[in-house]
Amino acid sequence: SFEPAIAGVQVVFHVVENPIVREINFSGVASVPFAEYQKQMKTQTGYILNVHDLWEDLYGLREWIATEYGYLARIADLSADTDGRIDVELAPTTLKDIVIEGNEKTKDFVIERELSFGLGDPVNLHEVDQSLRRVLMLGFFDEISRDFSEEDDPDETVLTIDLTERKTGSATFGVSYSTQDRLVGFVEAADENFLGRGQRVNATARFGKKLQEYELGFYEPYIDKTGTSLGINLYRRSKQVQTLLKNHEELSKAQRTTNGGDLTLGRPFGEF
């Protein structure tokens, strides 16, 4: 204000001090223990409110939530009254969509069933990275990366999962020799990601003058949503055997054939 003075006017500044901070409340992300962060804030109860310190605390709050608890959140509302009460409302970022790129062979559902989150869920970086580790452990990919987009709605984001596939099929052939079976040829073929459905198929054939073996295997990692797996193996083995007759002078030759298989069911006990 201005007041008259000798030979002019004098300017009087009226200073209104900020209130003493009595209470700080956080809301919006229920699973985060904000009391832990309050201990390291510059703004503390019992002291005069410093606006610059408060803004610095709020800037660090978002990074702390993301680093310690994985959530992406923004400051949606901030209020402070003359009684020293500060209310901070946060808005968690939710998942608007999931985009999967780079999977030329692998079907989307093979990747999606390893994700523990879905559309509309609050984004948790720890949960996202844990799910992507499960995808990598499938053995179908060499590299996996993620990216979050900025949408028109600041409370939504789109997760893009970028994959680099590896070759999962193999085929080998060759010959072996033993004094019992003589010369034996073999052919083996397998695919760890059959038709891109995450199933495993393998076939083996061994053949020679005295021996013929055929094996076929199939493995389905998910026969239900809980991760129960099913494995089926079938085989046929035919081998020429010789038996010394009672006169100990002649050998009897016969072809022994065995058909069989096995069925296995499994359930995961841990994360990986």
How would you describe each model-predicted region?
Residues 1, 53-74, 127-144:
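Amphipathic, non-transmembrane alpha-helical segments in extracytoplasmic/periplasmic proteins
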Residues 2-53, 77-127, 149-185, 225-233:
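Periplasmic POTRA and POTRA-like interaction domains that precede
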Residues 33-36, 105, 122-272:
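Gram-negative/organellar outer-membrane beta-barrel architecture
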Residues 1, 57-61, 66-71, 80-85, ...:
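Short beta-strand/helix segments in adaptor/scaffold domains that form protein-protein interfaces
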